[in-house]
Design a protein with these regions (language model features):
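Extended, hydrophilic extramembrane loops/domains of integral membrane proteins
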Residues: 91-129
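Conserved positions in beta-strands of structured domains
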Residues: 38, 84-86
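Residue-level recognition of conserved beta-strand edge/terminus positions
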Residues: 54-55, 72, 116
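Short coil-to-beta-strand transition motifs
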Residues: 72-81, 107-109
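Structural motif
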Residues: 49-51, 64-67
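Protein maturation boundaries and topogenic segments
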Residues: 1-59, 122-133
């Protein structure tokens, strides 16, 4: 009985370790950064509690209207919003959260760019938050 329980526990821990590797370490080798969504500004496209993967290797010049990007604000805060207007000459974007009624105040510069969203896993971020605690 103990050996069976031990095998199940080992299997579970191995599965959790592999899932962690696949969710966090493997994507980073391809330039992707996992981020947990904590606000509802991008709902319904990206629900609160999702994990999104952004790729910083996609160049700023290749971002177009409709793309979802992550960008940094002062104090280490990052934002994930949709590009609604692009100005390649000034090297800026206008962004807006899908759930917001108006565009974000101010422009986002190319220097603030953290990456383009590649894909998301809805609600998986809740699990990650629980495991971190």
């Amino acid at each position: 009985m103990i050996k069976a329980t031990e095998r199940i526990l080992r299997f579970f821990l191995t599965a959790v370790g592999m899932a962690g590797f696949c969710l966090f370490l493997l994507p980073q080798t391809a330039g992707c950064t996992p981020r947990v969504v904590i606000s509802g500004s991008m709902e319904p496209a990206v629900p609160v509690g999702s994990i999104v993967y952004t790729n910083r290797w996609i160049k700023q010049e290749n971002i177009k209207e409709g793309d979802i990007i992550a960008y940094g604000l002062s104090g280490g805060v990052s934002v994930l919003h949709r590009v609604v207007e692009t100005d390649k000459n000034s090297r800026i974007w206008r962004t807006k959260g899908d759930a917001n009624e108006v565009s974000d105040p101010g422009a986002v510069s190319y220097e603030q760019y953290l990456g383009k969203m590649i894909f998301s896993l809805p609600y998986v971020g809740y699990l990650i938050s629980v495991l971190k605690e």
